[in-house]
Swiss-Prot record:
Similarity comment text for this entry: Belongs to the radical SAM superfamily. Biotin synthase family.
Positions that bind [4Fe-4S] cluster: C66, C70, C73
Source species of the chain: Geobacter sulfurreducens (strain ATCC 51573 / DSM 12127 / PCA)
Quaternary structure and partners: Homodimer.
Function in brief: Catalyzes the conversion of dethiobiotin (DTB) to biotin by the insertion of a sulfur atom into dethiobiotin via a radical-based mechanism.
Listed PROSITE patterns: RADICAL_SAM (PS51918)
Needed cofactors: [4Fe-4S] cluster; [2Fe-2S] cluster
Organism classification: Bacteria, Pseudomonadati, Thermodesulfobacteriota, Desulfuromonadia, Geobacterales
Name under which the protein is recorded: Biotin synthase
Reactions catalysed, as given in the entry: (4R,5S)-dethiobiotin + (sulfur carrier)-SH + 2 reduced [2Fe-2S]-[ferredoxin] + 2 S-adenosyl-L-methionine = (sulfur carrier)-H + biotin + 2 5'-deoxyadenosine + 2 L-methionine + 2 oxidized [2Fe-2S]-[ferredoxin]
Residues noted as binding [2Fe-2S] cluster in the record, renumbered to the chain: S143, C203
NCBIfam families, sorted: bioB
Length: 329
């Protein structure tokens, strides 16, 4: 079995694709076979993307009171949490955070707002003004994560300077009703398609540890491949008190790493960033995410939880002998 991941990597490098049954089998590997999987994923990443690492950062630009009932989310109005609640911040604060992110080495800066969708009018106008300033004043690539959007909104964001639109599927279609019942999975899929039609790159992934099966993790990866997304953020549940998943069992570091590796083999030439929950779930194996095929990570704080200082991530990358891709505007 130890040669099996290597043979799959060779096949993928030659242009073949990983199918569902192969992916499910890989998630069952243990011991030295799992190490062989990580090595295969790392080889595939190096072949298609090189060894440079992409860093990204976000601002929680509008927080709390979300009408959706996503079971993992601290910002849902359906859950009693201590998440901060505030309206959309001003363009100066957004731009200042973008400058700070660029100074910390981030390649991409995401403007994230709570809620089902951003409102047309002043909210959208303010975000567009901030996007224009970010493009003028920094070399960082701006991204937006504003919920469900229509084509006109997507076009306005792109024309203002947004490079990427972020919108997660969160989990597999077959498991989604266990996570959220206030909107349909197809709305999220259509948002991805709308952003692509408007000429935006799409960053789309999900969160693991919600109670989904390994097979459902593969299911989401295959959906992302079908949607032809450009980059995939992989998050791991950090349970928040007051949410329905506050007492959820954590997945093991090795489960996290195998998931990262299988996503790399399913999506060989796409950017894969490990984001929220990495500190809690990977623990002492955080640096292994790159050995398992990740090509990037989020630095700084997350939406409602604290990340570690960027200097620690820079030191981790230096210790691994990895370089950070530079912003080029």
């Amino acid at each position: 079995m130890i040669n099996y991941p290597e043979s799959l990597a060779n096949r993928i490098i030659k242009g073949s694709t990983l199918d569902k049954d192969e992916a499910n089998e890989l998630l069952l590997l243990e011991g030295t076979d799992a190490n062989a999987l990580f090595l295969a994923a790392s080889r595939v990443r190096d072949h298609f993307l090189g060894t440079g690492v992409d860093l990204c950062s976000i601002i929680n630009a509008k927080s709390g009171r979300c009408p959706e009932n996503c079971a993992f989310c601290a910002q849902s109005a359906h859950h009693a949490t201590n998440a901060p609640v505030y309206p959309l911040v001003d363009e100066e604060q957004i731009t200042a955070c973008a400058r700070e992110a660029a100074g910390a080495g981030s390649h991409c800066f995401g403007i994230v707002t709570s809620g089902s969708a951003i409102s047309r009018g002043e909210e959208l106008d303010r975000i567009c003004r901030a996007l224009r300033r970010i493009r003028r004043e920094t070399a960082i690539e701006p991204s937006c994560s504003l919920g469900v959007i229509d084509y006109e909104t997507a076009l306005a964001l792109r024309e203002a300077g947004a490079v990427t639109y972020h919108h997660n599927l969160e989990t597999a279609r077959s498991f989604f009703p266990n996570v959220c019942t206030t909107h349909d999975y197809e709305e999220d899929v259509e948002t991805v398609r709308v952003a692509k039609r408007a000429g935006l790159k799409v960053c789309c992934g999900g969160i693991f540890g919600l109670g989904e099966t390994p097979e459902q993790r593969v299911e989401m990866a295959l959906t992302l491949r079908e949607l032809d997304v450009d980059s995939i953020p992989l998050n791991f549940l950090n349970p928040i008190e007051g949410t329905p998943l506050a007492g959820a069992d954590r997945i093991t570091p090795l489960e996290c790493l195998k998931t990262i590796a299988v996503y790399r083999l399913i999506l060989p030439d796409r950017k894969i960033a490990v984001c929220g929950g990495r500190e809690r779930n990977l623990r002492d194996l955080q640096s292994w995410m790159f050995f398992a095929g990740a090509s990037g990570t989020m630095i700084g704080n997350y939406l409602t939880t604290t990340g570690r200082p960027p200097e620690q991530d820079w030191q981790m990358l230096a210790d691994l002998g990895l370089t950070v891709r530079q912003c080029n505007g």
